[in-house]
Structure formats: structure tokens, C-alpha cells
A protein has these predicted regions:
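Positively charged n-region of N-terminal signal peptides that target proteins for export
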Residues: 1-5
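Intrinsically disordered, low-complexity, mixed-charge
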Residues: 7-181
């Protein structure tokens, strides 16, 4: 009896461990969410607002995009961990030093895109640096999907900008490196 009971107990325990792992994986994917929407406020264009949004995406390892819209709003899409999206949306509502405060974010659920592994600011320019050529700044999601600090996110963002900008625009950017965007 002992010879049969032990292998069955080991098999049962292994099954429990496998089931727990599957539940954990299921919970992780259940926390994944995608939202799309618009941000409105008094001053959210030409003040580094989309760069601030991208830095939030870098901090929280979120995919998506930020794009200026001719009506003065900013179109956004965020995809990733629900709690991290909530933190990013809270920061977007608050704004940055140069942007308006108490911004209105209208975001709705969107379908998850399992192939989306980047966050892009489309058509980035910098009024304060006199960079008028538009650039698409692309952040690649980290393999570990960990959160990083605001300072680390700023360093990553600077690296993205430095690797994307060309010629005089790159020189202008480097001259003002460390300025808030």
C-alpha cells in the first residue's frame, strides 16, 4: 500500500503545484488591459506633455502611443498591467510642470494586442529646443516587465531621443539635456 500511496501523493502534489502555477499565470494575464482615449486640458500641446506620458509608459513598462490631435487634445493608448495603467492615467490627469493641471482623461477599454511591444510618441517636436522636425520616439518594452524609477525612466527617454534625433536637432537636444520636456 505504501508503495502505491507515495507515488500517488507525489503525483497529486505535482498536480497542485502545476494548477497553482496556471492560476498565477491566469491572474497575470487577467490583469492585462488596454485602454484608448483622449486627454484635454488648457496646455497639453507644445509643453512636453507627450514626453511625460511616454516616461510614464517607460516607468510602468506599458505599450501604446501618444499623438497630438488638431483639436488640441492628445490621443492616447495604453496597454499592460491594469494597476500600472491606473498609475499612468493618474499622472496624466495631474500633468507636468509645464502642462495644465487637472487634465480630463476620457479612456475606454480596448482590445488587447498581443503583438504590441512598443510605446510611441508620434511626431514629437520641442518648442523649447527649437526642434521643428517631427520624430517618432519609440520605447521597446523591457523583457522583465518591471517598474523603474522616474529618474531611470528619464534616462531611458533621453537615450531614445538621442538615438532618434539627427543632425542639428540632436545637437539642440544635447545642449538642453536634463531640461524637462
Amino acid at each position: 500500500m505504501k508503495l502505491v500511496a507515495y507515488p500517488l501523493a507525489v503525483l497529486f502534489a505535482g498536480g497542485l503545484i502545476f494548477a497553482a502555477a496556471m492560476l498565477t499565470a491566469g491572474e497575470a494575464s487577467a490583469q492585462q488591459e488596454a485602454v484608448t482615449g483622449a486627454v484635454s486640458g488648457e496646455a497639453i500641446q507644445k509643453v512636453g506633455f507627450r514626453a511625460m506620458i511616454q516616461k510614464q509608459a517607460i516607468m510602468y513598462d506599458l505599450a501604446g502611443y501618444a499623438r497630438n490631435v488638431p483639436d488640441g487634445t492628445v490621443s492616447i493608448s495604453l496597454q499592460g498591467d491594469k494597476n500600472r495603467i491606473d498609475k499612468a492615467l493618474a499622472a496624466i490627469r495631474v500633468g507636468s510642470k509645464k502642462s495644465s493641471r487637472n487634465n480630463v482623461v476620457t479612456a475606454v477599454s480596448a482590445p488587447l494586442d498581443s503583438t504590441l511591444k512598443t510605446f510611441t510618441v508620434y511626431g514629437w517636436t520641442s518648442t523649447s529646443r527649437n526642434i521643428t522636425n517631427p520624430y517618432d520616439l519609440v520605447f521597446q518594452l523591457r523583457p522583465a516587465s518591471d517598474e523603474i524609477s522616474k529618474k531611470e525612466a528619464a534616462a531611458v527617454w533621453n537615450t531614445i531621443a538621442e538615438s532618434t534625433l539627427k543632425g542639428d536637432d540632436l545637437d539642440k537636444f544635447k545642449k538642453h539635456l536634463g531640461d524637462e520636456d
